[in-house]
Amino acid sequence: MLNDISICMLTLDNIKEKVYFEYRRAQMEAMKTERLGVIHVSDVIKPCMRNVVYNKITPHTMSTEDMKSLYFGQIVHSNSMIAKPENNEMFLAYNYVKDEPLTREEALKIPAEDPEHLDIIYGSIDDLIEIDGKWIICDKKTTGSIDYFGRYNSKPSESHVDQINRYRVLLKKCYDIDATFGCVIYISNKIEKDKRDIPIPMAFKLKPIEETLADMIEKSRIIKDAMTECTLPERTKCYLCDGMCPFASTCFEDNRKKWKE
């Protein structure tokens, strides 16, 4: 009798709500990835170090639209291996103070709160492939603007080019492999029945390692000082300021020297 009552109490709305939140939970689980350290390649490609520091000291929140984009990207990355297994998702960790690489095992042994992490730049290469004796660093990017990249005269995003140039530096430091070309593969995150699904690879030559390394170290030192001394780097007028920085309204009025007294 009690079982009959409990079945009667279960409504279609109850089921829909339960399934909805279970799906959202599954999305969150799928987006979890191992992320060691403090300073990452995604930090040292930014034009504004204040943006980077705000991002590290501010609690992270995410809208469902942000989740959708990240979730789709994670699914694509985990199910589209372009390179051989040993050259897919290549771990990168470089101590720029000691000029030494670290293996994943060595990095994992460093406690999360150890300040040594501030001496290390971390990253991960999607795929490294070899064509006619030349190494090419490939990076997959999902986008809602596939039509833009599909134009005959389009170029890859500058930030994506900068990212792969930094991967070149870490690849040489960590594996002694010198890649001279990069390729961003743009993949549409939209499903449109009236359009063909066409991934768009965009290849380019990479910059000299020394030039890129100097910029990486300079930015890493700014981040290290900011996190160690609790200081705020100078704001930098750049493309992020207008509509692309979630901290803009804070930054415009924030004249503090320190983010923590």
Residue map of PLM features:
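Metal-dependent nuclease catalytic cores that hydrolyze phosphodiester bonds in DNA/RNA
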Residues: 1-136, 144, 150
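Metal-dependent nuclease catalytic regions and adjoining charged, substrate-binding loops involved
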Residues: 4, 10-14, 104-112, 169-261
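Soluble or luminal CAZymes and related metallo-dependent hydrolases
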Residues: 68-76, 159-163, 215
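Metal-dependent nuclease catalytic cores in nucleic-acid-processing enzymes
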Residues: 78-84, 131, 153-186
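Residue-level preference for long, well-ordered alpha-helices that form the structural scaffold
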Residues: 117, 156-160, 205-212
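Short coil/turn motifs at secondary-structure junctions
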Residues: 132, 143-145, 187-191
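Short helix/strand-bridging catalytic loops that position acidic/His residues to coordinate divalent metals
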Residues: 146-158, 203
